Amino acid sequence: MTAAAGAPGLPVEVEQLMRQLKMPHARTVAPELLATARAQRWEPVEVVKALLVEEVAGRGRSMLATRRKAAGFPTGKTFAAWDPEVSSIPTPTQQALRTLEWVHRRENLVICGPSGTGKTFFLEALGQLVVETGRRVAWFTLEHLGGLVAAHRADDTVTKAVTRILRAELVVIDDIGLLPVSSDAAEGLYRVVDAAYEKRSIALSSNLHPAGFDELMPKTLATATVDRLLHHAHVCQTSGDSVRLTQALDGKGVTPLH
């Protein structure tokens, strides 16, 4: 509901009180809502209830937008655009993961497979579901995580940075195996996985199965990371041709020129 242009404004005293009470959403709709209430002869309790419902709904929308922005999602994709039939992840597995019970249990999710097989899309759509349930998500690429470690090493605040990351109930680390892994990135991955162990959920996408992480980072560090990551993890392996490449070859990757 939005304020109608012809609806009389609120009395100044009432508007000021609503500002002091931090009720911006109810204040915005109040003129129109009060006009409707007068015309339809609402009971006073109905007016109060309607204003409170608008405020609660507006706060919910604002908090959701804040969580989405804080998550750092790469594209904004959701399951509204997801085709479960195209994915090589079994449909029952997709459905089970979408319940988010694994996040509630602080379990991990690893999706590994070739590029273009929907790993990032699926993780982002899951992350969107998580924020819609009122929980927080933190999204990183491994390169970004390495940069964070390097930036905080100078003043010895890496541990504090990891603690801040783990304020989120779900931490997503995307696209492992696409680029060479720096020592900072390897350390960042270990630190986050270690700190999250049995306390938060990690969702990870990779071109490699975690068993092959010792090809990307020092064996000792890889072993310790994978041990903690996989102990309580669901592992899904994707396969098949790149969806992006298939769409491009079929002429579906662009809007036709006219």
Range-by-range predicted roles:
Residues 98-106:
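Phosphate-binding P-loop
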Residues 1-16, 251-258:
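Intrinsically disordered, low-complexity and often Lys/Arg-enriched segments
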Residues 106-122:
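Walker A/P-loop nucleotide-binding motif
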Residues 124-128:
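A conserved segment at the C-terminal end of the G1
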Residues 15, 19-74:
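Interdomain "pre-motor" coupling segment immediately N-terminal to P-loop NTPase/helicase cores
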Residues 82, 123, 141:
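Conserved hydrophobic/aromatic pocket- or pore-lining residues that grip, position, or stack substrates
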